[in-house]
């Protein structure tokens, strides 16, 4: 006999039924269907053949491998099967309550093949063809190093002729962060660097292994210093940004394997760290070989970084006195003597002279060509 609607007996029965459902769910949970079984079930329902799955899975051979459980479902396949056959995402993902992640923006805009060749996906051991089939999964895992952190891109310093590829820059930055995370550093103390530290770093340029000593000095101060080859179409010499933990770091590409470029780029990025990085979550990407563009001339951050780097490398009063005393014709001996008086590498003074005169044919032998990369393990 049914309980009367709205009666106490009906409420007790409803509560009893709910308790039974909860008990059964807890003690006898219903497992999700197997994703391949679910595909076969939908094929049977819809009267589909294997060839009908090509548009979801990619090719006849891939369909066969998936249905024979010899190939895992990729996110791309799962999305198409979910939309096309209506199979719940949690079934295809084999995850109770699982939801498909939003597709990675610009998935096909990253230099994926170059990233693979350079070992950016060190956690993956398959061939390039296999990597391309799970591109989204690999890129999602690779960019997880950012931990959801977003950066305010400062105006990239680059020539008008060279437009930096934003996707390649993002990939390069993620790789630099990954390499930095592989090392251990002491805590970074905010404001611990001073201009005296900068001057000490410049003094290290007098030594053949000065770049290595500079990296060691910065890392002892809790600042990662990464050397990472630039990706195509980035035109990148150096960068400065924070890790997700808030630790500032420097990364150089050694695109121009010269001592003068190394020391100027390093001091330029350190100037950004010292002057600008605490203000916001900035990332600075710099091409330091080209003159400032018209827009950069009006960017105070680039002008300030240039000014501090130049001042620390060679004090303005010392430079002006030397230039007025030496006259128009400057010999290699003059450059060596001036550098020796300052306790710095002659490459720095030779590079400054070439920059100011615009005569890049002179003093090439004094710039420390191919003297930097050989000191570092290339990444």
Can you annotate each of these PLM segments?
Residues 11, 24, 30-35, 41, ...:
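Active-site hotspot residues in diverse enzymes, especially metal/ion-binding acidic/histidine motifs
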Residues 43-44, 72:
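Short amphipathic helical patch at the helix-1/turn junction of helix-turn-helix
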């Amino acid at each position: 006999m049914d309980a009367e609607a709205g009666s106490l007996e009906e409420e007790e029965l409803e509560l009893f039924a709910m308790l039974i459902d909860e008990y059964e769910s807890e003690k006898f949970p219903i497992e999700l269907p197997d994703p391949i079984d679910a595909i076969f079930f939908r094929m049977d329902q819809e009267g589909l053949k294997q060839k009908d799955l090509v548009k979801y899975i990619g090719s006849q051979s891939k369909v066969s491998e998936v249905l024979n459980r010899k190939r895992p479902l990729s996110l791309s396949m799962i999305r198409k099967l979910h939309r096309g056959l209506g199979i719940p995402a949690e079934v295809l993902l084999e995850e109770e309550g699982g939801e498909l992640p939003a597709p990675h923006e610009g998935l096909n805009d990253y230099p994926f093949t170059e990233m693979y060749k350079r070992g950016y996906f060190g956690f993956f051991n398959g061939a390039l063809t296999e990597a391309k089939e799970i591109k989204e999964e690999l890129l999602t895992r690779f960019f997880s190093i950012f931990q959801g952190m977003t950066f305010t891109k400062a105006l990239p310093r680059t020539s008008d002729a060279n437009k930096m590829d934003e996707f390649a820059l993002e990939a390069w930055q993620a790789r630099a962060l990954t390499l930095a995370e592989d090392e251990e550093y002491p805590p970074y103390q905010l404001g611990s660097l001073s201009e005296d530290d900068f001057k000490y770093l410049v003094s290290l340029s007098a030594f053949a292994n000065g770049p290595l000593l500079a990296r060691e000095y910065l890392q002892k101060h809790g600042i990662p210093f990464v050397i990472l080859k630039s990706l195509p179409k980035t035109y990148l010499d150096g960068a400065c940004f924070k890790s997700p933990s808030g630790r500032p770091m420097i990364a150089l590409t050694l695109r121009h394997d010269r001592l003068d470029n190394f020391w100027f780029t390093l001091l330029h990025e350190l100037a950004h760290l010292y002057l600008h990085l605490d203000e916001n979550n900035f990332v600075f990407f710099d091409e330091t070989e080209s003159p400032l563009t018209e827009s950069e001339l009006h960017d105070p951050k680039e002008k300030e970084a240039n000014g501090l780097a130049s001042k620390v490398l060679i004090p303005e009063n010392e430079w002006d006195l030397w230039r007025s005393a030496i006259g128009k014709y400057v010999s290699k001996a003059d450059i060596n003597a001036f550098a020796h008086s300052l306790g710095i590498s002659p490459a720095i003074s030779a590079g400054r002279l070439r920059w100011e005169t615009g005569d890049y044919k002179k003093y090439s032998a004094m710039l420390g060509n191919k003297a930097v990369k050989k000191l570092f393990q290339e990444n």
